[in-house]
Regions:
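N-terminal charged segments
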Residues: 1-69, 82-84
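Acyl-donor-binding surface of acyltransferase catalytic domains
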Residues: 51-130
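Helix-loop element at the rim of GNAT/NAT acetyltransferase active sites that forms part
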Residues: 68, 136-138
Length: 138
């Protein structure tokens, strides 16, 4: 997962704010301080699951993450290769919500620095800007 552009970034932040553990068949990601954070408490699978995997995945989640009574969800994530499909109708029939997240990445060879005409005007922050910035952040 370390070379997948989306998951590598997620795992960077997951390690910063929580725990990432590599198991034989998947990774566990836990954010103990945020039990209701679906994408901070999940199993990360190397390949898409099938309906046959539902039982052992749920048991693994419950044993490694869901033992905390504050966690009242199960979340599984996995990468999809181009043209690959997930076969998770059994999960959906059991009440799981299926969603796909897309990652757009541009390699160093394709990246072009913006030209002067592409740049938006910018100014440094002043002391007076900070109150407005803090209000915006909340």
């Amino acid at each position: 997962m370390e070379d997948h552009p989306g998951f590598a970034t997620d795992l960077l932040f997951d390690r910063y704010q929580g725990e990432v553990t590599d198991h034989d068949a998947f990774w566990t990601v836990r954010t103990p301080g945020s039990p209701d954070y679906y994408f901070g408490n999940y199993l990360l699978l190397p390949t898409p699951p099938s309906d046959r995997d539902k039982g052992w995945l749920e048991a693994s989640f419950d044993r490694l993450i869901g033992w905390d009574p504050r966690i009242r969800h199960r979340t599984f994530q996995w990468p999809l290769a181009a043209g690959q499909n997930s076969r998770v109708a059994g999960f959906v029939a059991a009440g799981y919500q299926y969603m796909e997240c897309v990652v757009l990445a541009l390699g160093a060879m394709e990246w072009q620095a913006p030209t002067g005409s592409d740049l938006a005007p910018a100014r440094p922050f002043t002391a007076a800007d900070w109150d407005q910035w803090l209000a915006f952040e909340l």
